[in-house]
Amino acid sequence: MGLRASGTGFVVLVLLQSCAAYKLICYYTSWSQYREGDGSCFPDAIDPFLCTHIIYSFANISNNEIDTWEWNDVTLYDTLNTLKNRNPKLKTLLSVGGWNFGPERFSKIASKTQSRRTFIKSVPPFLRTHGFDGLDLAWLYPGRRDKRHLTGLVKEMKAEFAREAQAGTERLLLSAAVSAGKIAIDRGYDIAQISRHLDFISLLTYDFHGAWRQTVGHHSPLFRGQEDASSDRFSNADYAVSYMLRLGAPANKLVMGIPTFGRSFTLASSKTDVGAPISGPGIPGRFTKEKGILAYYEICDFLHGATTHRFRDQQVPYATKGNQWVAYDDQESVKNKARYLKNRQLAGAMVWALDLDDFRGTFCGQNLTFPLTSAVKDVLAEV
């Protein structure tokens, strides 16, 4: 019995160590509260044990200081951080910037010593006041002239966090969201330098394809497709990860993005294969109400009566129904991605976003909340 008890304890220890070895970074978006009916998501819907880190998106910058964006952000901050009462190991970060913020605003702040200093000084007290463990910089698509300013911002922010922690508090975490497109990486990021000062980098390995391309294609392929044009050879997660590592990002700081949303297209002809022409983005989802984008829970509804396919080379699924063509991820594809990042010895996975997964567990017929995020977690926990 003694040997069996000891063995069981060892297995449990290995499982805990295995799960703890990988980060599962999960974004939550504050605007998801405004979706109608069952699409409305608040932080109290989140399982506190699902992710290792939850990032609240987004904070604003007003008068060069970090600030709230939504009218009820402070209430939502408190609701999110209350999750740590149930799971004290959970880390929460506040993301500043995002798509609607605009790279020009970041550029204006970071390029001037005084405004940059004002912003940096405002961050630690704001995070401490609202119970966050760190900051996520979502300066998306910085320009060529912004490269050194972003590096300086990251370096000085990390130094400020270190100084603030000298009072005896745990140092605040610092992360950044980085585009996975080769052109965007080359133009705006000194990967080797910013990696030195960041605790982790969330690589946005999705949105490689969209309605702006005039043809159908998958937005989050794991690998290059055999039928991809030479211009698309960089547009996959495998290339983006390899390129980031080649540029000097440490594997133990690189987190690979996995989307819980799909991209939809309206076909312009009866053709449905790769490269088929489109007339524009797909019709809006019932809850997200944005052309060309569908939450996973909306995709589950779409799949009723649809024809499903899988790109074997890219290892991702798509579905067609009428004149609608939808690229998405399912449990099989996200598990493959999680196994891939483990094989590459990356720091973990990032999910965009919890509120786009089937967070209620009522849409996808699996009787499981957050089925995609849970599938990623299960693979990360495998020995």
Curated annotation (Swiss-Prot):
InterPro entries linked? Chitinase_II/V-like_cat, Chitinase_insertion_sf, Glyco_hydro18_cat, Glycoside_hydrolase_SF, Glycosyl_Hydrlase_18
GO terms assigned for molecular function: carbohydrate binding; chitin binding
Give the primary localization class: secreted
| Gene Ontology BP annotations | activation of NF-kappaB-inducing kinase activity; apoptotic process; carbohydrate metabolic process; cellular response to tumor necrosis factor; chitin catabolic process; inflammatory response; lung development; positive regulation of angiogenesis
Alphabetically list the UniProt keywords. Antimicrobial, Apoptosis, Cytoplasm, Disulfide bond, Endoplasmic reticulum, Glycoprotein, Inflammatory response, Lectin, Secreted, Signal
What is any one of the record's Gene Ontology cellular component terms?
A: endoplasmic reticulum
Per UniProt, residues of the GH18 domain are 22-383
- Going by the UniProt annotation, this protein carries glycans at 60, 367
Q: Which SMART domains match?
A: Glyco_18
Query: Which residues are connected by disulfide bridges in this protein?
Result: 26-51, 300-364
Per UniProt, chitin binds at 70-71, 97-100, 141, 204-207, 263, 352
Q: Kindly state the subunit structure of this protein.
A: Monomer.
What does the function comment of this entry state? Carbohydrate-binding lectin with a preference for chitin. Has no chitinase activity. May play a role in tissue remodeling and in the capacity of cells to respond to and cope with changes in their environment. Plays a role in T-helper cell type 2 (Th2) inflammatory response and IL-13-induced inflammation, regulating allergen sensitization, inflammatory cell apoptosis, dendritic cell accumulation and M2 macrophage differentiation. Facilitates invasion of pathogenic enteric bacteria into colonic mucosa and lymphoid organs.
Q: Which family does it belong to?
A: Belongs to the glycosyl hydrolase 18 family.
Name this polypeptide is given: Chitinase-3-like protein 1
Q: What is the lineage of its organism?
A: Eukaryota, Metazoa, Chordata, Craniata, Vertebrata
